[in-house]
Amino acid sequence: MATIGMLYICTGKYTVFWPEFYETFSRNFLPGCKKEYFIFTDAPSIAHEDDPAVHRIAQPAYDWPLSTMKRFAIILTQQKALEQLDYLFFFNANLTCREVITPEEFLPRPQQGEQLLLVQQPGFWNKKPMFYSYDRNPRCTAYIPYNCGRA
């Protein structure tokens, strides 16, 4: 059984979304897999924190866009624990899981040569690569020139 790390930042007003996120993902997302929830929050307490799989991590709220820019630094505060997991998923705070998503339909199948799982942000569906938010700075190691990305 795979162990799934659920990365969730809910500071400030976003804490209101946590209970429904937890309930729908616990019920519908990858049934049969062990899930560990890493909740980065400024709330003094959160719903379901009595569940041993819920890890509340104190995190001050940042104004946007700093909250987005510091996302990976925030997540890496838990690097040692995260290295013990098979898969990591970061979720926007307002996401819910309404339908059952099974491991067979979602996780990579190593026996078929699959090693990675990629999820496309819905904002990019049906867009031409020219309009993707690639880094266009030629001095950046992540640089992708216009008309050179892939859908």
Language-model regions: role of each:
Residues 84-96:
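Short beta-strand-to-loop acidic/aromatic patch adjacent to the donor-nucleotide binding site
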Residues 1-67, 80-84:
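N-terminal anchoring/stem segment of glycosyltransferases
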Residues 96-139:
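Conserved donor-nucleotide/metal-binding helix-loop-beta segment in metal-dependent transferases, i.e.
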Residues 4, 86-88, 117:
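Generic beta-sheet signal
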Residues 73-87:
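Active-site nucleotide-sugar/metal-binding loop of Leloir-type enzymes
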Residues 69-70, 83-84, 139-141:
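Glycine-rich loop/turn
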Residues 49-62, 72-74, 105-109, 113-115:
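Active-site regions of enzymes building and remodeling cell-envelope glycoconjugates
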Residues 141-151:
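Catalytic core and acceptor-binding pocket of nucleotide-sugar-dependent glycosyltransferases
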